[in-house]
């Protein structure tokens, strides 16, 4: 598979390392400080290409649209851009584009999401009060994280005692 890395920070480097170990080809690395490879990307054939997007909340939407302009499917792990999600979904439907996105791709965290939903249901039945606390490194770009937002939204969806969350 040919891969475009959109965002070449910590996650971009990790994705690259694993992709190369598995025999995939990195055809472009696009980062906020280095947009040099964009023209090469536009000139390449786009079949058998997927873009893996781990950039920033400020650039994710632009990156997704750039890929859609070239009919390149996107896997997006960036959060903090979801206020534009409805328009991206509409574009996917209208133009038959492909987007797979999640606030966290970790298997362990996705198990935690499921357990959180069950806990929210049980706590409603027995009257327990739920709260979330999140701690991150100082370089975290989206605060609260998409993971924390997903946990909070799942509690609201699973427990009628909650209808919103706040910082």
Residue ranges and their predicted role:
Residues 32, 79-81, 104-105, 135-137:
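Short, ordered loop/turn segments at secondary-structure junctions
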Residues 26, 74-75, 98-99:
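Hydrophobic beta-strand scaffold residues
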Residues 2-6, 10-42, 58, 126-167:
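C-terminal substrate-binding/catalytic lobe of Rossmann-fold NAD(P)-dependent oxidoreductases
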Residues 65, 69, 78-101, 107-121:
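Rossmann-fold NAD(P)-binding glycine/threonine-rich loop
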Residues 106, 120, 137-141:
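Short beta-strand and adjoining strand-loop segment in the mid-core
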Residues 41-78, 86-91:
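Rossmann-fold NAD(P) dinucleotide-binding segment
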Residues 6, 54-55, 77-78, 102, ...:
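Structural motif
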């Amino acid at each position: 598979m040919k891969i475009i890395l959109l965002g070449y920070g910590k996650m971009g480097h990790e994705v690259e390392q694993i992709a190369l170990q598995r025999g995939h080809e990195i055809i472009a690395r696009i980062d906020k400080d280095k947009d040099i490879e964009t023209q090469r990307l536009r000139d390449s054939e786009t079949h058998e290409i997927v873009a893996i997007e781990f950039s920033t909340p400020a650039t994710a939407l632009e990156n997704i649209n750039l890929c859609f302009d070239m009919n390149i499917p996107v896997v997006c792990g960036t959060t903090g851009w979801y206020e534009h999600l409805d328009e991206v979904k509409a574009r996917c439907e209208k133009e038959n584009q492909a987007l797979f996105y999640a606030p966290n791709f970790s298997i362990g965290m996705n198990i935690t999401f499921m357990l959180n939903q069950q806990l929210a249901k049980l706590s409603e039945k027995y009257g327990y009060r739920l709260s979330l606390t999140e701690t991150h490194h100082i370089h975290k770009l989206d605060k609260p994280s998409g993971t924390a937002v997903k946990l909070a939204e799942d509690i609201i969806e699973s427990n009628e005692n909650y209808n919103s969350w706040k910082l």
